Swiss-Prot record:
EC nos: 2.1.1.33
Natural source organism: Xylella fastidiosa (strain M12)
Keyword flag Ligase: no
EC class: transferase
Gene Ontology CC terms: tRNA methyltransferase complex
Source taxonomy: Bacteria, Pseudomonadati, Pseudomonadota, Gammaproteobacteria, Lysobacterales
UniProt name for this protein: tRNA (guanine-N(7)-)-methyltransferase
Length: 244
């Protein structure tokens, strides 16, 4: 079964699915599309051909996709796109791939990218596991970023968390040697699970040492919700792993 996750871990229907694909999906969760504004709907019509990548289930040459050879950065579950948009504005030497299944977030980022005149960002509105398995070659990525995945705070729901051993192994395959994996969470027990999983995954080494964390890197913008939480004493864990 596909593991369809938005940036906050909510399973939702991705845009490219056909009716037959929806019928054969076995789901044990409530689907949520959220509030889709007219502007976000127009963004799909006007800007998807420019920034969007339709899932075809075949490996892609990423240099051909972007029309140049540059380091490739993937953000899984970009939410409303704030971090991805910020990175594209401030690190134009990179090519960015974003994956998100929550349609309003994709629409919002499409509008933002068009406003910025971005040329080095491509978006999937699809399942990240499927994209990684079928469209991105092993060793093709220089960085993978996953920010604030849903913590599924109830213990009985921990199995739904994105960061699991099989997924971590998949990420390692897609990173080139010398690349890095950056994750952020504001849930202590999810940080513990991330350490448990990633420290046990061959090919990954914590840059800050065993069960270590790093300050928020310059490439990740802090959201107003994050800043508000920190003002209330909430912690954020930034985990940075090197691919070896």
């Amino acid at each position: 079964m596909m593991n369809l996750l938005s940036s906050d871990g909510v399973q939702v229907l991705p845009r490219p699915f056909t009716l037959n694909e929806r019928r054969r999906e076995v789901r044990s969760f409530v689907l949520r599309q959220g509030h889709f504004t007219p502007a976000q709907k127009r963004a799909f019509d006007h800007y998807w051909p420019r920034f969007g990548v339709d899932f075809i289930g075949q490996l892609r040459d990423l240099d051909v996709l972007f029309g140049r050879s540059a380091p490739k950065v993937l953000e899984v579950g970009f939410g409303n796109g704030a971090a991805l948009r910020f990175a594209a504005q401030h690190e134009p030497r990179y090519d960015y791939i974003g994956i998100e299944v929550y349609a309003p977030g994709v629409g919002r980022l499409l509008n933002g990218l068009a406003e910025d005149g971005s040329r080095h960002v491509r978006l999937y509105h699809y399942d990240a596991v499927e994209v990684l398995n079928k469209e991105i070659a092993d060793g093709a990525l220089d960085e993978i970023r996953i920010y604030f995945p849903d913590p599924w705070h109830k213990k009985r729901h921990h199995k739904r968390r994105l960061i699991q051993p099989l997924f971590a192994t998949l990420l390692v395959r897609k990173l080139r040697v010398g690349g890095c994996l950056h994750m952020a969470t504001d849930w202590a027990d999810y940080a513990e699970q991330m350490w448990d999983v990633l420290d046990a995954t061959p090919g990954l080494v914590n840059r800050a040492g065993l069960r270590g964390q790093v300050p928020c890197p310059d490439w990740r913008v802090q959201t107003r919700f994050e800043r508000r939480g920190q003002n209330l004493g909430h912690r954020v864990w930034n985990l940075l792993y090197d691919r070896v």
